[in-house]
Amino acid sequence: NGQKIFGMVDSGEDWDYPDGSDPRYPLRSGITTSTGYDDEVLSYLDSLGVTSDNLQFYVATHPHSDHIGTGDTIVRLYSPDRVYLLPYDDSYIYNTARLWDNLYVYDQLLTAVEETEGVTLIQHLNPGAASAEEGSPDFAFGNFQIQIVNYEEDYLTSPKEDANQFCLGVIASANDHRAFLTSDIDDVEGDASRIVSNYGLYSIDLMTSNHHGY
């Protein structure tokens, strides 16, 4: 019908960080405290015409601030129809040097979703679900077909070294073309190789290469 619709996969670092006053959120070494892209992200979305009426989904790939730090602001300002956010707790990471402000950004996004009217939180993806609202990882988005991948939840009972090992990815397909948004999926446990094999991604038209080089 010619109306714009939008979806987002991550949204970048923000200026917010824990000050250490809350014992749940220590000010750990490695937490980003001097960089944020709130203004740039919001300005770009506004320039595209994103509003609270046309943002259909926000995929929070994993709880690292350089990916979802601005997520709570996005939710509060643009109230996406659905937010995809896998469960997180610091106990899911066995390498304490990689906890950073993971729980802080996760809890902030979760709170924003809970406090924003009309936003559906999806924390568990199920290929047998009847609709996107019920947790299907595959859904139509305008002329696109979206597939959310790497949503297995083994990390809930078998802790990982880093949240990158339970990081969502997104495949977008339209008009016989495909794009793969990798986020921070790596191959430490074979995730990248498995996804390429399972989804036939040996030949694609566009890939956002993550900063881990896999």
What are these language model-derived features?
Residues D90-Q165:
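Metallo-beta-lactamase
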Residues Y78-D81, V119-T120, F144, H177:
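A structural micro-motif
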Residues F57, S65-V113:
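Active-site HxH/HxHxD metal-binding segment of metal-dependent hydrolases
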Residues R82, E117-I122, A129-S136, F166, ...:
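Acidic/His-rich, metal-assisted hydrolase cores and their charged scaffolds
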